[in-house]
Amino acid sequence: MAFKYHKVAIVGKHYKKEVSQMVETLYAYLQQQGLEIIVENDTAADTSLVNVAIASLKEIALRCDVAIVVGGDGNFLKASRLLALYSNIPVIGINKGKLGFLTTLAADDNALKNDLYAILKGDSSVTKMSMLKCRVDNNLRAPLEASIALNEIAITASRGLMFGLKVFIDGRYAFDQRGDGLIVSTPTGSTAHAMSAGGPILNPNQNSVVLVPICSHSLNSRPLVISDESVIDIYITDYNDPEPVLSIDGRHDTILKAHQKVTIQKARKKVTVLHTKDYNYYDTLREKLGWSKVLF
């Protein structure tokens, strides 16, 4: 069977020796298969590869059939989110980090080659991961990449000081809250910051968004799962200096002022992730997060 994906990009975490070594090994293997390979600019600079085709993430998204991301979940988040802004290019994650929840292919040499060979031939399963976009009412010039989240959009307190917010869903008042913040998470992000704050785990294919309070000063504040078609408006009602901060997947911090409105809704783009044919999301929950693990 011929390869389904012929032009392959490699994107690696920068300044990490074991990632650079994996990129070089991966490049040699793909070259043996007769595939056209493009390496992301900074990734190539970290390796000893010479005379290789290089490109930016935007160019990769527009020119390649598939992108292989080598590193941890953080690197996968950043790269896949940016790639998805420019095209529908599918992404394969190889784990060279700690947890490897999103980068589902193990870096074991023999198993990796077999898995990659099958996926590049088209023998794979696919997950479509939804994203969120946000707008701050007085920050209309924010770059697009600073407004799109694959995991979550979080509004958090500075230096642990409580603040107040008011939430509307689809134009209707939902709730007020005082506490350390609020996380608005995708199903993908439900196993990240949102889970640590007590939120539920959502299947990545679920068409939902979850709102998770962070240390709400209330005995009856609970996470709320809503349709991902809903539009969420969050108003900052009061705070103690310094101001609360809005972050996108843990990056791009924006200072928020009293009475500012943050609008969050589903993004048009999705991240397409390729896995092995036998990939099972619930296996990942058990193996990576110890879900339902028998303790005694």
Swiss-Prot record:
PANTHER family: NAD KINASE (PTHR20275:SF0). This is NAD kinase. GO terms for cellular component: cytoplasm. The active site is at D73. It catalyses: NAD(+) + ATP = ADP + NADP(+) + H(+). GO terms for biological process: NAD metabolic process; NADP biosynthetic process. It comes from Francisella tularensis subsp. holarctica (strain LVS). Pfam families: NAD_kinase, NAD_kinase_C. Belongs to the NAD kinase family. It is found in: Cytoplasm.
